């Protein structure tokens, strides 16, 4: 009999937390044949990425996953064999007590935020005995073989390659979104938090020698985009042109369509964790807007990733990439940084592709979790 899995997700940062846990739950069901319940405290954050989902349902089945609303007033349920608390969320006290009362305690995993910092390898898989006698294990996603790896479906890169090698597939997908870039335009996606350097980047795109079509899924960055255009907040479907730059606001799409959007673009600016990982799998030059933390703690996290990602670049391309990422995240001139990066475009393209290949050589996160459970028996 297959093990049962419970994944708890408390929505903190809009779509990032639910994005990761929904992908994980889907993969555990589809590729490992597991029975998975996904507990979400805010289903309004879930429905945009899962068309057909009901934000008011206490229970619903979506793509083989038993999706449950995590109510403030917890109703008793039997705990699963494997319990994952995503991103240090606090499980219901009554559920934890039911875990303790089981004849065989479940495997309790704390799925941590993704980080490339050196200390992650030493903490991955460490147990944390609890006062009630249970044991919680810290499970860290990451970029090295001494971590839990990244979320990656088994067929992901093959599907990406087939899509990117088919001009017809790309054109059909973009037309379905109402996107019709002019011939030879650089296609760029932008999914980010508010950023004071947005205007300087847009200025550079608008005055560039190559036409640019900027695709912006609805979200927090749209207000800044509208301000740069001198307009009221742009509704979904809006298309505006300023010199060489065409700006288009897209609707929120499913996770699978978001992957296709990233695959379609020549450059992807992303944020948070879920879209950050998916942009890496897209194999295109990218830019990450990291989530801001107190006392600029996020800068260490940013530089830790860049220390891995930049390996193999020429000194000139390395400096340009570093300058671009720091400009976007540390409030330096994005216009100059963008122009510098464009001078090394072929190398950055090849490097992004090789990075995806190297990361795909490691076990994916879902498989690592399943193996960890089996080894614990």
Where are the regions a protein language model picked out?
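Extreme N-terminal starter segment of soluble prokaryotic enzymes
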Residues: 2-6
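Short, glycine-rich nucleotide/cofactor-binding loops
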Residues: 7-18, 191-196, 267
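Active-site and donor-binding regions of nucleotide-sugar-utilizing enzymes
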Residues: 9-33, 37-133, 219
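A donor-sugar binding/catalytic signature common to diverse glycosyltransferases
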Residues: 22-26, 252-301
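A short helix->loop->beta-strand "cap" motif at the edges of active sites that frequently abuts
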Residues: 103-107, 210, 284
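A nucleotide-sugar donor-handling region in carbohydrate enzymes
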Residues: 112-199
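C-terminal amphipathic helix plus adjacent low-complexity
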Residues: 153-155, 311-377
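Donor-nucleotide binding loops and adjacent catalytic segments primarily
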Residues: 172, 179-259
